[in-house]
């Protein structure tokens, strides 16, 4: 029983990490290639399966070595409010 529960938990973690989840829309990486935008991938995903964006993992970090302290990056670069709520 414990092995089954552990296996199920492990599979769910792996599947969550490999899918473009709708929650990623709040945290799109401004450096991401357009075709790997989590929101766009979710919209194009008609059959309900997972789209792993060819292994691309969204990340909130400055683009191209940008070191400006006041420059917006991560969610704020996409116009997402500081509180992290998704625009409807």
UniProtKB/Swiss-Prot annotation:
Entry membrane topology: Lipid-anchor
Positions where lipid (N-palmitoyl cysteine) attaches: 19
InterPro entries for this protein: Cys-rich_OMP3_Chlamydia
Keywords, in A-Z order: Cell outer membrane, Cell shape, Disulfide bond, Lipoprotein, Membrane, Palmitate, Signal
Localization (cell): Cell outer membrane
Gene Ontology terms, MF aspect: extracellular matrix structural constituent
Signal peptide: 1-18
One of the Pfam families matching this protein, by short name: Chlam_OMP3
Listed PROSITE patterns: PROKAR_LIPOPROTEIN
Functional summary from the UniProt entry: In elementary bodies (EBs, the infectious stage, which is able to survive outside the host cell) provides the structural integrity of the outer envelope through disulfide cross-links with the large cysteine-rich periplasmic protein and the major outer membrane porin. It has been described in publications as the Sarkosyl-insoluble COMC (Chlamydia outer membrane complex), and serves as the functional equivalent of peptidoglycan.
Name under which the protein is recorded: Small cysteine-rich outer membrane protein OmcA
Provenance organism: Chlamydia trachomatis serovar D (strain ATCC VR-885 / DSM 19411 / UW-3/Cx)
């Amino acid at each position: 029983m414990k092995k089954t529960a552990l296996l199920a938990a492990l599979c769910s973690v792996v599947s969550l990490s490999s899918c473009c989840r709708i929650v990623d829309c709040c945290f799109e990486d401004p450096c991401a290639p357009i075709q790997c935008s989590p929101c766009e991938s979710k919209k194009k995903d008609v059959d309900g399966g997972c789209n792993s964006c060819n292994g691309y993992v969204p990340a909130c970090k400055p683009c191209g070595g940008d070191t400006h302290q006041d420059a917006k990056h991560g969610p704020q670069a996409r116009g997402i409010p500081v509180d992290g709520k998704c625009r409807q």
